[in-house]
């Protein structure tokens, strides 16, 4: 038997033999995202670029932070000599400027799921973790602009009708009844997600015409929304092109799920706490990228060389 230390040494030597194979061709449509890691208790940033069409990882490296300088350097390193047409990124305000400086003709798709998280955050900032059913319905109207949430909206309409029919004018008792209805909705959404997962279905995407129509109705009724969501509606309208690129170019994905899945598949939450040096981080990320791209890490011949 071999000691854990010896096996770890074999592992690191084998990883050090892995040579990075730089992409010589790409689709021109990419995900870019970041993940924060720990190195000896210090936070560092993992910068990653993935081709949306081929699925290949073009970059997976660590830097001390996610400054504009670090991001520009990473993008240039990953994409130098390759076509650059579009990116899907989250809604960080720095990304459009960075991309425009490096690639003036590149288009941007903002991650719709990131938009949904912001909408939910703004809703709970105004109303707490248990917003009124009507405000919850308004939030789902916004979710429904780019993805089809008709099923959830119909359920909320049913619950709102029951609430209006059964409330008695006693504030405390009405609030308790609304709380029961909110719980019913949460259970409904949870079961809906499970059903979609079992059946391998995603939430359907809206077409550009559907999005335009739904958003026009929201703008017309914007006075019924909370103040923060009214402001969010204005921002969506201002940046409409960055939310709808996926509807105008079939290669572009509406969310950053494609790179989030890579992060989840390659480093678990516990793994992220285990790095003791910059070398260990670089070694692990190099192995993640190589293995994802189909390189064999531990061939019989390489193991014999290590011995």
Residue ranges and their predicted role:
Residues 3-88, 93-101, 105:
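RNase H-like nuclease fold core
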Residues 87-142, 263:
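Conserved beta-strand -> loop -> alpha-helix junction used to position metal-binding or nucleic-acid-contacting
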Residues 7, 33, 55, 87-90, ...:
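Mobile genetic element proteins and their domesticated derivatives, centered on retroelements
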Residues 56, 106, 122, 126, ...:
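Phosphate/oxyanion-binding loops and surfaces in catalytic or ligand/nucleic-acid-binding neighborhoods
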Residues 94-96, 136-307:
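Acidic/histidine-rich catalytic cores and adjacent linkers
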Residues 40-44, 120-122, 287:
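Short, solvent-exposed polar/charged micro-motifs at secondary-structure junctions
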